[in-house]
C-alpha cells in the first residue's frame, strides 16, 4: 500500500493497557494555564524510566471551561491504578497548586471507569482552613493560598486506556523525517482523547527491550539498533532501506482504542505529505506482549 507515494508497511503497532486520567487546568490567562500544564506533565515520556506517562492533550477556550477561564486538558497515565493516584497527587500538588491563579477540574466525565479522591487528599494542604463547596455544578474544595484560593474538584475520573500506539517515519534525510514528525504531531493534536508524551511528541531514540550485547544485560532497554541509520550496513539485522537516512517515531497514549487508531491515521496522513518521506512502519513485539494490535494498512480501509 502507498499513500501520497509513501510505502505503508504491512505490519502493526503493539500497544498496552494503561490507567488514564484527564485533568482540566484553568488559570487567569492562557499563559499561566500552559505553564502549569507543562510543569505537571514533565518527565513523563515513558514508564520505562519515568514515574508516569503524561502530556498536554489540548487547549480549552474560556467558553468551554467550568469557570470561564482558559485552560488545558492534560493526561497522566500509569499501568498501576495506585501509582496513578500517587502521580496525580504529586504532579497536581507540586506543579499546579504552586502555579499562580490555577484551578483543576475533572475532564474524564462520563467516560470514567472509577473515581479517585485526589481533590479530597489535596485539600489537607489547607491545614483545616479549606472549605468544601459546590461550584459550576461540581463538588470542590477551596484551599487558602497566598494567591487567594486554589479550587480543586473533589474527585477525578480515571479509565483503562491504551498506551504505545506508534509508527515510524523513514525519510531520505534527518531533516525531512523531523519535518514529517512535526507535521504528524500537529495533526494528532486535533484528535480528542490522546497525547504524544515524548518531547514535542517525537521520539529520537527508539528503544528495544534489554540488550543485544551480552556485556550490557543489566540494561532494561537499549537503542533500537535495527532502526538506526548510522548502523545501516554495520548490523546484519538493520531495517533501514538504502534510500533512508532519517527515522523518527511517534508514540501515542489515549483514552481508548478508537482514539489511538484515529490519531495514528491522522499522523501518518500528515507525515506522508512531506517531501522526502519514503516509508511508514510500526513497532511491535510479535504480538506476544501487548493486548492491542493496530495494523497500519487497516487504519485506511
Curated annotation (Swiss-Prot):
Q: Which GO terms describe its molecular function?
A: formylmethanofuran-tetrahydromethanopterin N-formyltransferase activity
Q: Which reaction does it catalyse?
A: N-formylmethanofuran + 5,6,7,8-tetrahydromethanopterin + H(+) = N(5)-formyl-5,6,7,8-tetrahydromethanopterin + methanofuran
**Coiled-coil region list:** none
Identify one Gene Ontology CC term for this UniProt entry: cytoplasm
Q: Which GO terms describe its biological process?
A: methanogenesis, from carbon dioxide; one-carbon metabolic process
Superkingdom of origin: Archaea
Record note on quaternary structure: Homotetramer.
Please identify the protein, giving its name as recorded: Formylmethanofuran--tetrahydromethanopterin formyltransferase
Amino acid at each position: 500500500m502507498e499513500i501520497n507515494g509513501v510505502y505503508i508497511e504491512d505490519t502493526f503497532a503493539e500497544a498496552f493497557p494503561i490507567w488514564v486520567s484527564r485533568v482540566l487546568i484553568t488559570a487567569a490567562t492562557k499563559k499561566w494555564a500552559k505553564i502549569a500544564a507543562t510543569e505537571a506533565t514533565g518527565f513523563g515520556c515513558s514508564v520505562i524510566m519515568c514515574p508516569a506517562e503524561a502530556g498536554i492533550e489540548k487547549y480549552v477556550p474560556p467558553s468551554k471551561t467550568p469557570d470561564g477561564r482558559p485552560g488545558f486538558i492534560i493526561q497522566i497515565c500509569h499501568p498501576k491504578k495506585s501509582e496513578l493516584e500517587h502521580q496525580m497527587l504529586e504532579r497536581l500538588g507540586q506543579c499546579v497548586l504552586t502555579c499562580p491563579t490555577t484551578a483543576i477540574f475533572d475532564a474524564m466525565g462520563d467516560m470514567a471507569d472509577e473515581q479517585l479522591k485526589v481533590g479530597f487528599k489535596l485539600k489537607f494542604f489547607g491545614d483545616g482552613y479549606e472549605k468544601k463547596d459546590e461550584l459550576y455544578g461540581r463538588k470542590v474544595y477551596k484551599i487558602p493560598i497566598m494567591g487567594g484560593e486554589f479550587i480543586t474538584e473533589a474527585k477525578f475520573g480515571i479509565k483503562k486506556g491504551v498506551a504505545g500506539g506508534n509508527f515510524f517515519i523513514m525519510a531520505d534525510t534527518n531533516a525531512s523525517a523531523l519535518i514529517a514528525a512535526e507535521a504528524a504531531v500537529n495533526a494528532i493534536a486535533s484528535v480528542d482523547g490522546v497525547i504524544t508524551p515524548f518531547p514535542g511528541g517525537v521520539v529520537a531514540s527508539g528503544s528495544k527491550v534489554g540488550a543485544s550485547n551480552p556485556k550490557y544485560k543489566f540494561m532494561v532497554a537499549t537503542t533500537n539498533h535495527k532502526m538506526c541509520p548510522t548502523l545501516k550496513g554495520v548490523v546484519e539485522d538493520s531495517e533501514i532501506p538504502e534510500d533512508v537516512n532519517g527515522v523518527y517515531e511517534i508514540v501515542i497514549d489515549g483514552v481508548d482504542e478508537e482514539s489511538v487508531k484515529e490519531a495514528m491515521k491522522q499522523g501518518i496522513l500528515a507525515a506522508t505529505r512531506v517531501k522526502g518521506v519514503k516509508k511508514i512502519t510500526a513497532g511491535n513485539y510479535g504480538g506476544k506482549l501487548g493486548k492491542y494490535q493496530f495494523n497500519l494498512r487497516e487504519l485506511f480501509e
